[in-house]
Every structure is written in C-alpha cells, then in structure tokens.
Amino acid sequence: MISLAWQKRAIPLYWKILTHKGANNLTEQKAVIRPVIRLLKGQKIIITAHREFHSIFLSHWLKKYQKLDVYFVFRQKKSTMIKRGKKYCNLSELKVNVGETKLLLNQKITKILKVKTYNLLVYKRPHGLTCKLNGRYSNHLRQ
C-alpha cells in the first residue's frame, strides 16, 4: 500500500492485494510504486518505507526517477555492506555512539558493481542501529 502523509494522517493512494504470504519482491514493489509516481507527476515525492523495501535494486530503480523530483528514504538492515575506504564492512561495524547521528555521503552500498552511491544516515538507538538509505534526499534535510 502507498499512502500520502498529510497533517499527521495517512491517506491510501494505491494498493495491491497479494495472494501469497511473506515478503513481496521487486516486481511487486515496482507495480505499486509506478502508478503513484505517474499520479503525482510534477510533485515532489519522498518515498519512505519499512524494512521490507530495503532492496538495493529498488533503490537503484528509484534513482532513475530523481529527475522527476522523486526521492526515497529506506531503512537498511545492520548486515548491509558499505564500502569504507578500500574495504567493505557491515553497517553494524560502524562506530556510532548511542544517540549519535552520522551522515555518510556518497556511500557505495553492497558489493554489487552496477549499484551507484547513496547517502546514508546512521543513528544508534539504545537497543540497536537504525540506518536509512536515500537517493540524495539528505540535501533536502538541510533546508
């Protein structure tokens, strides 16, 4: 389901009923997102999603829509690999103090060669690490 966040309310815009249990795949995610991008064409869109939408392939696909003012912010698993210097490490290996936020710009995410760079916001909660991947959205956070 895709909803419009408006004045602390969520207004459903588009949804699909899945015939299977468990996580949806990239094809199903695109099938739900694409009509909403068309519907809101010309509007600035920021897609936020729960961890089921953490796919680097979905992020790669959505980056193509940046010229249409479509941005995204996705939570990432602690096991997500990022490139730090010449080596890769898990997000869980980053040195972040509880309550601290780090903005890592232009990060190579995963070891997949065709994937571009992303901005990554890392925040350590008392009970874990929250990581958000985005398509250049952090530039808008500073405004």
What kind of feature is each model-predicted range?
Residues M1-L4:
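Active-site cores of enzymes that catalyze phosphoryl transfer or operate on phosphate-rich substrates
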Residues W6-Q143:
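Single, function-defining residue in the core of a domain
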